[in-house]
């Protein structure tokens, strides 16, 4: 404790203030010592042991969603950072007496899974290695080559390279994704067959770090059960609602403090289908049925979307979650990328 602010008010030196404070203190936690103009308080080992062994009072439930990385390849250090931070919050809240649910939101119907599925169904191993060699991405065996997340990411990377050369690849992936957004059971099953071994490999990696999840929720759940469609219909009654020339629906958020070029939050495409963020609305509505408090751990690149989703949730009379953002580190040779290996 620095005593400089008190010295002028009391009309004596900071050193004298520090000593007077120490002389007047009666501490249960240990001892106080005056060190020049500072007061140092030292907790005794007995007090610390009692605090650690003391069972905290129950504080209610909290669902902490973290990691939720696309199941298209192994963790790189950037994606794993979310898991470490998220698990830290899980452990801290458990230690503080909360009933914590560690949640993983599985992106089981997006473009990344669509690319992986298309690649596994259309590319053989020889074609994959040929494409990777041409693209300068190593496909040499590694100590982890047998793990499905390390093995299948090669197909994902190869398909991305081929997509840049062959428009039919993008068309094929787009068709799969569109069918998944229509809750096509066959396509969703094919997607799961493609990504589940990858997700299992990713979870094995996290398990070695002592990171585990209590629940997994698939994004497609909210398409299949109709809750996304219900959300979109409700948003049409919002005063913020608008329709673009191509028939897409959006909320105009400028009046809510969103600035810049992205003041419109699009939630329905012109063809009537939903977007990822729309499904996020239904997901948060569901999460509130599972817990009395919600927390999301996100990278700072999600700040705008998180704010947009929060405003949309308020328009639906749903409380937004607490969000913890973490910053990124710039690397000399560019961003970490699963697609580029």
Task: Please provide the spans of the model-predicted regions.
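NTP-dependent nucleotidyl-transfer catalytic core
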Residues: 1-341
């Amino acid at each position: 404790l620095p005593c400089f602010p008190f010295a002028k008010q009391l009309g004596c030196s900071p050193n004298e203030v520090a000593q007077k404070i120490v002389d007047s203190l009666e501490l249960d936690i240990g001892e106080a010592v005056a060190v020049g103009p500072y007061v140092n308080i030292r907790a005794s080992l007995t007090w610390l042991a009692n605090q650690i062994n003391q069972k905290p009072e129950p504080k209610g439930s909290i669902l902490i969603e973290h990691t939720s990385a696309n199941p298209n390849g192994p963790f790189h250090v950037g994606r794993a950072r979310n898991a470490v931070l998220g698990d830290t919050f899980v452990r801290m809240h458990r230690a503080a007496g909360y009933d914590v649910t560690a949640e993983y939101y599985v992106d089981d119907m997006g473009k990344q899974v669509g690319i992986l599925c298309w690649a596994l169904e259309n590319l053989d191993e020889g074609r994959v290695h040929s494409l990777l060699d041409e693209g300068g991405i190593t496909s040499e065996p590694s100590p982890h080559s047998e793990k499905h997340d390390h093995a299948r990411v090669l197909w994902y990377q190869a398909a991305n390279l081929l997509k840049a050369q062959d428009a039919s690849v993008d068309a094929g992936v787009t068709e799969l994704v569109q069918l998944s957004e229509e809750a096509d059971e066959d396509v969703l099953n094919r997607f799961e067959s493609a990504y589940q071994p990858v997700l299992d490999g990713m979870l094995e990696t996290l398990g070695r770090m002592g990171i585990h999840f209590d629940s997994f929720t698939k994004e497609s759940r909210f398409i299949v059960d109709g809750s996304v469609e219900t959300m979109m219909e409700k948003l049409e009654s919002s005063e913020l609602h608008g329709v673009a020339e191509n028939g897409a629906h959006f909320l105009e958020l400028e009046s809510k403090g969103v600035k810049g070029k992205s003041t419109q939050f699009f939630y329905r495409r012109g063809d009537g289908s939903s977007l990822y963020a729309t499904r996020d609305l239904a997901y948060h509505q569901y999460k509130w049925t599972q817990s009395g408090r919600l927390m999301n751990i996100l990278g700072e690149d999600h700040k705008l979307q998180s704010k947009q989703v929060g405003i949309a949730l308020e328009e639906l009379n749903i409380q937004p979650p607490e969000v913890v953002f973490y910053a990124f580190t710039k690397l000399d040779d560019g961003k970490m990328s699963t697609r580029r290996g």
